[in-house]
């Protein structure tokens, strides 16, 4: 596997409203574990669309991993131009910082938002251009990642395409592990 697409919930879907929420570090730890294992297995590129939440936290994790594995690259392919236009200023600054550090940035449609079709096209291209999908996703709570996860599963039924998931139970395990380590 050379290229993995990563996605997951937006912050509000997780009840997270600030990047310093303790849940963010837990999610980043889970992402770090998975991505590091994939890098050790030959992963070269991580692709995201730049959504707030799991995708931008993934970018932060990639930047951390690049210290030890400098050949790992991050690409941000936005579904449309200026997706951050309606965001709060602090979120826009955070997003612009991530874009400034990414190895490649491009917009799939090269136009501003016009319709939900741009998201469908983004999902289609992400699945076509990647070897696997990693999603912070639980079928019990579908949310915004539902459509790309469904597209990945369909591709997996006809081709050698894998979907990997970080479930809520995985995050709970990390929380319990942290509590155990802090109790010692």
From Swiss-Prot:
Transmembrane segments: none annotated. Pfam families: YpsA. Signal peptide: none annotated. NCBIfam families: PRK13660.1. Belongs to the UPF0398 family. This is UPF0398 protein BA_1582/GBAA_1582/BAS1466. It comes from Bacillus anthracis.
């Amino acid at each position: 596997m050379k290229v993995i697409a990563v996605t997951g919930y937006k912050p509000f879907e997780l009840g997270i409203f600030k990047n310093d929420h303790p849940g963010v570090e837990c999610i980043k730890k889970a992402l770090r574990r998975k991505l590091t294992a994939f890098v050790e297995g030959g992963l070269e590129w991580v692709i995201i669309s730049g959504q707030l939440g799991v995708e931008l936290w993934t970018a932060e994790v990639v930047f951390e991993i690049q210290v030890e594995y400098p050949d790992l690259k991050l690409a941000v392919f936005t579904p449309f131009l200026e997706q951050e236009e309606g965001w709060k200023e602090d979120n826009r600054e955070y997003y612009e910082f991530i874009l400034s550090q990414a190895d490649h940035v491009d917009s799939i449609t090269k136009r501003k938002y016009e319709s939900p079709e741009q998201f469908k096209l983004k999902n289609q291209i992400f699945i076509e251009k990647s070897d696997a999908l990693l999603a912070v996703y639980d079928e019990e709570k579908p949310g915004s990642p539902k459509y790309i996860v469904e597209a990945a599963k369909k591709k997996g039924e006809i081709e050698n395409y894998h979907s990997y998931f970080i479930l809520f139970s995985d995050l709970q395990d990390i929380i319990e592990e942290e509590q155990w380590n802090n109790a010692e």
